[in-house]
Amino acid sequence: MLGGNDPHLLHRAKAEADASVEIDPALGVGHWMCAVVALYQRDFDMSAEKFFEAEALAPNSADLLLQHADALAHFGEAEVAWEKFQQAIDLNPLAPDIYWWAGASIAFKREDYGAAVELCGRMEDDEPALRVLTASHALHGDLAAAREAGSRLQENYPGMTAREISSLSPDRDPVANEKFYQALRLAGIK
């Protein structure tokens, strides 16, 4: 989520999501947005609750399933996340780049770094996925590709350290962020 680490933007997004739920509680999108905001506020239990409410209201929304899958991976439930990602792809086989980015992130959490690289390769523009691409190349053992992607990543995050970049991911388990940090270090990011 763009601005996912900006408390002011998260506060505004939460207010709008809450208003959406108040206007029409039977519409899944408000619950969905509440879930996304809660994820980036690191309120994992609320995020999980809101994603389940949203999915109950809109069970055939491929975009919702995708975001729920991504959130499940951040919660530490990578295998369940992968199944939900597959459901989203089944509903939207001509998926846009964000699907492949989310799938790569989930594959990374499953420690399937080759699949993560392959999913990034399906993107028309891999720039949004440079964090996961860099880390996946590093942990897959292709340090030359990791350093190349890492150079591009540093252009997008000028002046940020590997620790700061890795902390952008809202993971429940600190071990996940530490693994990501170590991968970025392998790619040559300080």
Segments (PLM) and residue ranges:
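Alpha-helical protein-protein interaction modules
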Residues: G4-V21, M46-F51, E55, A62-K190
